[in-house]
Amino acid sequence: MAMLRPALTLLVFLTILTGGVYPLATTVLGQWWFKDQAEGSLIRQHDEVRGSRLIGQAFSEAKYFQGRPSATAEAPYNPMASGGSNLAASNPALDKEVQARVQALRAANPDARAAVPVELVTASASGLDYGITPDAAFWQAPRVAQARGISEAEVGRLIRENTDAPLAGFLGQPVVNVLKLNMALDALQP
C-alpha cells in the first residue's frame, strides 16, 4: 500500500505533463515560431485556400502540369491515407501500371522529346509528392504551351521561377512545386 500512493502520484503527474503541458507547449511554440508550417503550409489566393505547399494535387487538364501519380488508398492524393502502393519492382502489376501511365502521357504529350521522366509514371513512397524535377516539368512544357496558346519560352520562364533550389544549395535536388506553377500559369492566363 505504501508503494501505491507514489505510483498514482507519478501517474497523475506524467499524465498531466505528457498529455496536457507538453502538447500545449509544442502547439503554442509551433504557432509562434513556425506559424505557416503549423497551419499546414497552405497556399492562399484571394483569401481562398488552394492547397498545401507540401501535398500534391491531381491535375488532368492539358493546360496544367501534372505531378507524380498518387498511390493513396480510396482516392488519389488523399492526405489521410498517405502511403505507397507497396508493389515490388518485380511485380507484374507495377509494370502494367507504369506502361499504362507511359502510354497515357505519350498520348497527351505527342510533342514531348526524350523518354517519359520516371517520376511521372511512378508514385512516391507517400503517394502525395507536391513536386517534380525541372526535367519532368520541361518535358510537359510543349503540351502546356500549346493548350494555353503561349510560347514554350514563357512556360520555361515560369518553370524556372517556381523551381526551389536544393536545401543549402547541395542537399537534394531542385524541385518544381506543381501547384504553385499551375497557379502562376492561371495568373498569367486563366
Curated annotation (Swiss-Prot):
It is found in: Cell inner membrane. Keywords: ATP-binding, Cell inner membrane, Cell membrane, Ion transport, Membrane, Nucleotide-binding, Potassium, Potassium transport, Transmembrane, Transmembrane helix, Transport. It is a single-pass membrane protein. It comes from the Bacteria. The chain crosses the membrane at residues 10-30. One of its GO terms (cellular component) is plasma membrane. Pfam families: KdpC (PF02669). GO terms for molecular function: ATP binding; P-type potassium transmembrane transporter activity. PANTHER family: POTASSIUM-TRANSPORTING ATPASE C CHAIN, POTASSIUM-TRANSPORTING ATPASE KDPC SUBUNIT. Belongs to the KdpC family. The system is composed of three essential subunits: KdpA, KdpB and KdpC. Part of the high-affinity ATP-driven potassium transport (or Kdp) system, which catalyzes the hydrolysis of ATP coupled with the electrogenic transport of potassium into the cytoplasm. This subunit acts as a catalytic chaperone that increases the ATP-binding affinity of the ATP-hydrolyzing subunit KdpB by the formation of a transient KdpB/KdpC/ATP ternary complex. This is Potassium-transporting ATPase KdpC subunit. It comes from Cronobacter sakazakii (strain ATCC BAA-894) (Enterobacter sakazakii). The gene is kdpC.
